[in-house]
């Protein structure tokens, strides 16, 4: 149920979090050049800008991670000037850009649930962990959570076996999430020059 999980709160599953001091601007953008099903990411002094291909060959979902101040500036631009800012950031790699949706922004935070299993309640994906979108790994981590849990439960039978599988899920997936959180922090600091 997402990063602000109501289930996690209802079952008193505490989290550790860290503010990345970055905001993400998300929008849908149409470009004059085809994306050829290729994702692009540019590393700017203020943070990365990712272009993720959508089914229409000219349409992308963008995620622009930047400082809170720069985020405010970008959101205040009219569509024409925002389009120019996106094109300049990409150095014209995708041709002309035209924003197709409302621009939305949210603060980026690392979240890590200290407990992922409570009885038969299991956290996974953004309810269990969020990381900086720098390398686009957040969704992949959530899919790995689901795949691992399905694999474990499909091999188990009985109440005791299921409890053992859930403990294994929590231990294994927490370790993988911790590795990715540390890696993203290192990459963020590397690209930020921190």
How would you name each of these model-derived features?
Residues 4-5, 48, 128, 174, ...:
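Alpha-helix N-cap/helix-start and coil->helix boundary motif
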Residues 6, 24, 85, 145-152, ...:
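Generic recognition of well-ordered alpha-helical segments
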Residues 9, 118, 171:
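Phosphate-coordinating loops and pocket residues in cytosolic domains that bind phosphorylated ligands
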Residues 50, 115, 133, 145, ...:
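Residue-level recognition of specific faces of alpha-helices
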Residues 151-194:
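C-terminal helical "tail/cap" subdomain of flavin- and related membrane-associated enzymes
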């Amino acid at each position: 149920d997402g990063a602000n999980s109501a289930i996690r709160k209802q079952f008193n599953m505490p989290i550790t979090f860290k503010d990345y001091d970055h905001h993400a601007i998300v929008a849908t953008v149409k470009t004059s050049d085809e994306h050829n099903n290729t994702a692009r990411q540019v590393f700017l002094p203020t943070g990365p800008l990712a272009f993720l291909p959508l089914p229409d060959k000219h349409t992308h979902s963008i995620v622009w991670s930047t400082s809170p101040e720069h985020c405010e500036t970008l959101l205040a631009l009219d569509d024409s000037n925002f389009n120019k800012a996106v094109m300049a950031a990409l150095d014209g790699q995708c041709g002309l850009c035209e924003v197709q949706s409302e621009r939305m922004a949210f603060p980026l935070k690392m979240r890590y649930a200290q407990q992922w299993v409570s009885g038969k309640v299991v956290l996974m994906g953004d309810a269990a962990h969020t990381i900086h979108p720098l390398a686009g790994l957040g969704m992949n981590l959530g899919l790995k959570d689901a795949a691992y849990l399905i694999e474990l439960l499909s091999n188990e039978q009985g109440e005791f076996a299921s409890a053992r599988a859930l403990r294994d899920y929590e231990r294994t997936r927490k370790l993988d999430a911790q590795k990715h959180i540390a890696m993203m922090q290192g990459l963020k600091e590397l690209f930020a020059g921190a």
